[in-house]
Amino acid sequence: MMKMGIRSVALISEAVKADLSLWKRVDNAEFQVVYATPEILLLPTSYFFKKMLHNQKSPFIANLVTVAVDECHIPNESKLDFRPCYSMLGRLRNCLPNATFAGFSATLTPVDIKDFTRTANLNRPAIIHELVR
């Protein structure tokens, strides 16, 4: 994305640990696209959860347009032992009422759609099925 002129960052545990100022840059809305896992965002010990999520004056929160959830089939109850933070997506939705939420998966079943809709507190789900090759 950087080659296309889109300021982006991937918040993975290694990057966050190596560059502690990264969160400040995210909070100051220096990036147009921020990639992060539910664990990075929703663990009670994370900077985002403690400092940014509940601060509507945060430039990042104020400018947030879309939250895209990859692997959105994971909230299926049989898979939550693997990634328990996916069960907390509804908290994220409740704190970011103006953001659009989008879920993506290559293996989504009707049960997974129902689970993701419930887990992420989506009150007006628009489901688009498209196979891209």
Task: Indicate residue ranges for each PLM-predicted region.
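Conserved nucleotide-binding/hydrolysis micro-motifs of P-loop NTPases
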Residues: 15-17, 39-42, 73-74, 106-111, ...
